């Protein structure tokens, strides 16, 4: 488990997050939601080891994260950042092989190549191995970088677990690519990995996550199972907009619908547009 306890981050005179506690548990997918500026990415950067907290403690599988070498951390957790655009003509397979760097001494071996190919297959990109990454669509590129992250932690360590940290993995993706990316992450969690995903779409969080952390103003407003925290009062208080929460017609998760009428919103006559 990645355990974050009473995390506070100060940058200059600004406090980005304050006394935040959360966890990424093996076999579960945790979604972090909240309005812009709530501190979601800061929390992920602390969980990944990229950012050292001003106060609080971070542990990875019951050991202080800072006590692990960068290589040891990289063999246990992989990060998919918000922006992963690549402008150089690397092939898809070359990019995915970069994920094997923490495991390689010298050149990649047959096992590394096999893992890279398996990771591409996991994100439904097996037929793209020889394509240059800049020639792919944005959604295809995102899946390639997800495959790179999966390849990095493909095999569980002997003395711990794997963790996949995703910072807005569905941003700017169409419906099909959003579902493909999060279904892949969900499957990875079902295989025993811990997954942390920052999401803006509350319905995606409700659909895929086991646990939801709702952040606001640099702190945790609520956390728990999707149905227990993605409620009309919580959403209205955090996001400043009323919603209706319905039973999903085909899945066992909440369905969140913005309530424009309750907010006093007006609908334009479509004939006047």
UniProtKB/Swiss-Prot annotation:
Signal peptide: none annotated. It comes from Salinibacter ruber (strain DSM 13855 / M31). SUPFAM superfamilies: P-loop containing nucleoside triphosphate hydrolases. ATP binds at residues 34-41. It is a peripheral membrane protein. NCBIfam families: PRK13548.1 (NF010068). InterPro entries: AAA+_ATPase, ABC_transporter-like_ATP-bd, P-loop_NTPase. The keyword Translocase applies. Belongs to the ABC transporter superfamily. Heme (hemin) importer (TC 3.A.1.14.5) family. SMART domains: AAA. The keyword Membrane applies. It is found in: Cell inner membrane. This is Hemin import ATP-binding protein HmuV. It comes from the Bacteria. Its EC number is 7.6.2.-. Part of the ABC transporter complex HmuTUV involved in hemin import. Responsible for energy coupling to the transport system. Keywords: ATP-binding, Cell inner membrane, Cell membrane, Membrane, Nucleotide-binding, Translocase, Transport. The complex is composed of two ATP-binding proteins (HmuV), two transmembrane proteins (HmuU) and a solute-binding protein (HmuT). Pfam families: ABC_tran (PF00005). One of its GO terms (cellular component) is plasma membrane.
């Amino acid at each position: 488990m990645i355990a974050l306890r009473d995390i506070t981050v100060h940058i200059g005179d600004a406090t980005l997050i304050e006394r935040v506690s959360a966890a990424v548990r093996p076999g579960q997918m945790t979604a972090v939601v909240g309005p812009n500026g709530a501190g979601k990415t800061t929390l992920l950067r602390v969980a990944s080891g990229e950012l050292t907290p001003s106060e609080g403690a971070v542990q990875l599988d019951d050991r202080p994260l800072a006590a692990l070498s960068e290589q040891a951390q990289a063999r246990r957790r992989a990060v998919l950042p918000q922006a992963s655009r690549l402008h150089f003509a690397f092939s898809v397979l070359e990019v995915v092989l970069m994920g094997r760097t923490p495991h390689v001494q010298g050149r990649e071996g047959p096992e590394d190549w096999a893992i890279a190919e398996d990771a591409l297959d996991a994100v439904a990109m097996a037929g793209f191995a020889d394509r240059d990454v800049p020639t792919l669509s944005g959604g295809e590129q995102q899946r390639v970088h997800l495959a790179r992250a999966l390849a990095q932690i493909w095999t569980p360590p002997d003395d711990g677990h794997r963790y996949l940290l995703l910072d807005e993995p569905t941003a700017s993706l169409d419906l099909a690519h959003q579902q493909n990316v999060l279904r892949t992450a969900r499957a990875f969690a079902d295989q025993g990995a811990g997954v942390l995903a920052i999401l803006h779409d509350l319905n995606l969080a409700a659909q895929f996550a086991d646990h939801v952390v709702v952040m606001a103003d640099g702190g945790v407003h609520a956390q728990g199972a999707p149905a227990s925290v993605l409620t009309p009062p919580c959403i209205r208080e955090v996001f400043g907009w009323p919603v209706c929460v319905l039973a999903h017609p085909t899945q066992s998760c909440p369905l969140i619908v913005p309530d424009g009428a309750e907010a006093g919103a007006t609908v334009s006559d479509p004939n006047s547009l």
